[in-house]
Amino acid sequence: MMTREVVLDANVIVGLLDSRDVLHDRANTLLLRLKAERAISVLLDFLVAEALSVICRRATQRRTSPPDLARVVGQHISLWFEQGEITPALSEATDFIGTCEIAVSSDGLLNFNDARLVLLQRRGVIGPVASFDESLCAVENFVSVS
């Protein structure tokens, strides 16, 4: 049986890192299911960066129970990095204009990082993507897991 790699989208990563996120339970359930299926969860560098940006924004804007940035970075992101679990993908998407064209063709439904995921998947660099983003998952021929 071939092991399947599944890229975790930023919304799934945020759900895993922020216990107050509306997708926290769903993200944990999805991760448990992927583990049960023996799928390998893939953390792409630009998606971890996007997730951290969301967590940083919440740390300054959320008045009740803001995320603990030190814990998120110290117990999760730094550990993932030290263990080699964060995959560098920025260099794989050298087609900046191609990524922009995908974003434009979506009429703005996809942000730059979502368009980059579509490009990486179309080129065979990545496989399925675990995401709760309906616009991303609706892209024609895009393989997603939710």
Predicted segments with their positions:
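Hydrophobic alpha-helical membrane context
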Residues: 21-23, 62, 145
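A generic structural signal for short hydrophobic patches within well-formed alpha-helices
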Residues: 13, 48, 136-137
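PIN-domain endoribonuclease scaffold, especially VapC-family toxins
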Residues: 4-6, 28-42, 46-110, 115, ...
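Short, polar loop motifs at secondary-structure junctions
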Residues: 131-135
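Generic structural "secondary-structure junction" signal
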Residues: 15-19, 112-114, 138
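Metal-dependent nucleic-acid phosphoesterase active-site entry motif
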Residues: 1-24
